[in-house]
């Protein structure tokens, strides 16, 4: 069986298209394989840095774009117009009108496609703007993340510093707590010692009372013995001896009492000092607790930048940057200079505390800013996620566009193959048509057949006619088949034009993408410059922070040196004060020894004077219950031994009590504890009668001060109170000008009722002066 020509043409056309498509795919795969090698893929996958990975991906995409552009240029370089012209020349003139009509339709379709392209460009323009905005935001977020990481590292180091400070303060607090416990134990021991001393004082007071009762009994016995004349001389001698022994015993007891009092006053002063130290320690502990709470609050709150705090540390007082050599202790001979130095150190310490409070305020501001930055960071992270989603969508669209472009390229290749096959088929048909035309001309040139009876000629003519009929059939078949082929060619040409327009649009998009890539490269360069500048600024700030830390350490050292200096100055001042107290104690001891010797001599002379005077004996006859000798004894022990001076006018009589004026106390007998307590007891004697430590109790007042007083008693008291001019010349001034400590014992020394308030005022002024002198 013979296969028709149409089937053969279709089979050959399919074989050619399959071969060409396979060759094209092989070439394309080989070229793409040259572009995407496994080495490049491994390099991209092994890149840990996102920047390098992005750069390598951009290079790969650029290579793909260049490949696509070259292929498009090759497609356009093909002489499609010449092919179309060759087809049009071969086609009959009747088809020209159809082609013109189809050209009009194609122009309309071209306009529609251009409108679609413009619409797509308008749709793509805002997406490109969004991409630029997204890239800017990503750059900002990346910078902020880098800054946040640096701040976090900074704050971690600063938090470690704060933790070390808190540990130091806790250790210091524990040491202070142990010191506080030790001081409390010492205070309790001092209290126990003070109570023991009080009990001993009471016991000695009872012994003194018993001793005074014995003296009274002995005085009564003396009175009984004096009534007998035979034993007077003997008893007088015995009484003198007993009196001297009693006076010595009383002096010893009074000395022990005074030592006990001095010990009590020393204990009281030590207790006061300990109480002050305990109060200072409590205040210091409270300050440390406040500092601990402040440090703990700072440790819990500080999670961000403290640059403001460090800037504030620069403005600290530069006067504190003193070296240790400048802070050495000099000569502390002048106590006022030492006090001024201590006051200046305290002022510096107060200034440091104020600066610390200002820094705490700045830290609170920094915490507020940290919270604000956290909120901004969260907002930026949310925006970043949104932008990343949009980028993924755009990448998906780009991949879909690439796939469409690949499909279009495949279709273009298929159409090219079809065009080539059609060209070959048309060439073959044209050759066969020319052959048939030549045969027809030959047939026409043949002579017409003769109608004869010759069979050979008839057969010849019939064979030629059959051949002519076959040729005419072939021609008709070709004419019937040509319009189908031409219609297919027109459709393929229209499709090619559409594909060309799409390729032009894709080229434009590629140009836009190139421009965007160039802009991205420029932005990357700018970002790199900014990163370099940021790194430089960070390096400078790190150096600045190191300088601030060094200054902070130097300030801490200066504070420690200042505290050490303050302690050394305190120790030096305490040593000076102790030396002065020792010197004053020595002077007081010397004066007390002199006073005791003088009082003993005077007592002996007074005893002799009492025995020789007849006036005393008359007084004993009138009032047997009283005795001038105990009065005199009590007078000597109840007199004030403080350094008071009584001034009188030379013209008036010194024995007149109203003419005596109190002068200020002397500064030569200033002591720390002994004279202070003695002066307080002496001044409070006229107001506190119920005090057990007083020289004379209420029971003794009943003995010495009776309601039945007479003129003789007052005169006798004046006699014993005031000395004669000879005695005044013999005795020293502080004994001559002495006055009784308790005026209730000596009514003759009372002032008038009008002047009683003045006397009390003078006593109060005296108290104030003593307190001012002893710095109470």
From Swiss-Prot:
Highest taxon in the source lineage: Eukaryota
Record key words, sorted: Coiled coil, Meiosis
Coiled-coil spans in chain: 87-122, 173-227, 265-307, 362-430, 496-595
One GO BP annotation of this record: meiotic cell cycle
Name the UniProt record assigns to this protein: Meiotic expression up-regulated protein 1/2
Organism: Schizosaccharomyces pombe (strain 972 / ATCC 24843)
């Amino acid at each position: 069986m013979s296969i028709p020509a149409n089937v053969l043409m279709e089979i050959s056309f399919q074989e050619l298209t399959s071969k060409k498509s396979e060759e094209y795919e092989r070439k394309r795969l080989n070229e793409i394989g040259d572009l995407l090698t496994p080495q490049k893929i491994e390099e991209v996958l092994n890149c840990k840095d996102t920047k390098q990975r992005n750069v390598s991906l951009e290079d790969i995409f650029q290579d793909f774009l260049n490949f696509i552009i070259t292929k498009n240029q090759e497609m356009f370089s093909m002489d499609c117009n010449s092919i179309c012209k060759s087809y049009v020349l071969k086609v009959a003139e009747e088809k020209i009108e159809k082609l013109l009509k189809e050209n009009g339709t194609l122009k309309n379709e071209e306009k529609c496609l251009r409108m679609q392209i413009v619409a797509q460009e308008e749709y793509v323009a805002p997406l490109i703007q969004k991409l630029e905005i997204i890239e800017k935001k990503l750059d900002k977020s990346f910078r902020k993340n880098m800054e946040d990481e640096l701040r976090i590292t900074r704050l971690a180091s600063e938090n470690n510093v704060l933790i070390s400070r808190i540990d130091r303060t806790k250790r210091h607090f524990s040491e202070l707590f142990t010191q506080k416990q030790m001081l409390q134990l010492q205070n309790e021991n001092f209290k126990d010692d003070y109570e023991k001393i009080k009990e001993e004082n009471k016991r000695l007071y009872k012994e003194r009372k018993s001793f005074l009762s014995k003296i009274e009994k002995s005085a009564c016995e003396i009175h009984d013995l004096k009534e007998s004349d035979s034993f007077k001389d003997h008893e007088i001698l015995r009484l003198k001896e007993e009196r001297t022994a009693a006076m010595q015993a009383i002096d010893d007891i009074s000395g022990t009492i005074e030592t006990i009092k001095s010990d009590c006053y020393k204990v009281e002063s030590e207790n006061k000092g300990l109480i002050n130290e305990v109060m200072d320690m409590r205040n210091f502990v409270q300050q440390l607790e406040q500092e601990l709470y402040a440090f703990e609050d700072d440790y819990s709150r500080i999670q961000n930048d403290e640059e403001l705090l460090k800037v504030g540390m620069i403005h600290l007082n530069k006067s504190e940057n003193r070296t240790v050599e400048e802070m050495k202790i000099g000569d502390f001979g002048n106590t006022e200079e030492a006090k001024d130095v201590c006051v200046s150190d305290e002022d510096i310490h107060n200034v440091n505390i104020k600066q610390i409070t200002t820094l705490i305020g700045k830290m609170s501001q920094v915490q507020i800013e940290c919270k604000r930055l956290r909120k901004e960071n969260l907002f930026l992270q949310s925006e970043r996620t949104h932008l990343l989603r949009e980028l993924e969508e755009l990448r998906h669209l780009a991949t879909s566009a690439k796939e469409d472009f690949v499909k279009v390229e495949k279709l273009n290749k298929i159409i090219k193959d079809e065009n080539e096959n059609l060209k070959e088929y048309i060439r073959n048909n044209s050759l066969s048509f020319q052959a048939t035309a030549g045969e027809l001309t030959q047939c026409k040139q043949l002579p017409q057949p003769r109608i004869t009876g010759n069979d050979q000629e008839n057969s010849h003519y019939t064979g030629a006619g059959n051949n002519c009929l076959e040729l005419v059939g072939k021609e008709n078949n070709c004419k019937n088949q040509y319009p189908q082929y031409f219609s297919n060619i027109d459709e393929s040409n229209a499709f090619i034009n559409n594909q060309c327009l799409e390729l032009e649009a894709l080229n434009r998009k590629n140009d836009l993408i190139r421009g965007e890539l160039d802009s991205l490269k420029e932005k990357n360069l700018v970002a790199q410059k900014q990163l370099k500048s940021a790194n430089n600024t960070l390096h400078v700030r790190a150096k600045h922070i190191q300088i601030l830390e060094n200054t902070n350490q130097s300030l801490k050292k200066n504070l420690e040196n200042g505290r050490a200096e303050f302690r050394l100055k305190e120790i030096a001042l305490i040593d000076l004060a102790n030396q002065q107290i020792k010197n004053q104690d020595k002077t007081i001891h010397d004066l007390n020894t002199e006073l005791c010797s003088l009082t003993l001599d005077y007592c002996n002379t007074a005893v002799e004077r009492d025995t020789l005077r007849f006036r005393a004996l008359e007084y004993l006859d009138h009032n047997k219950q009283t005795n001038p000798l105990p009065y005199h004894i009590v007078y000597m022990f109840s007199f004030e031994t403080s350094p008071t001076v009584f001034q009188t006018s030379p013209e008036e009589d010194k024995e007149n009590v109203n003419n005596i004026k109190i002068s200020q106390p002397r500064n030569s007998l200033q002591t720390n504890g002994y004279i202070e307590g003695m002066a307080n007891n002496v001044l409070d004697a006229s107001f506190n009668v119920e005090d057990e430590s007083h020289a004379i109790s209420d029971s003794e007042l009943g003995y010495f001060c009776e309601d039945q007083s007479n003129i003789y008693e007052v005169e006798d008291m004046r006699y014993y109170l005031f000395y004669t001019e000879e005695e005044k010349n013999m005795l020293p001034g502080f004994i001559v000008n002495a006055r009784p400590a308790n005026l209730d014992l000596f009514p003759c020394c009372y002032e008038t009722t009008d002047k009683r308030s003045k006397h009390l005022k003078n006593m109060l002024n005296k108290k104030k002066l003593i307190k001012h002198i002893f710095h109470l």
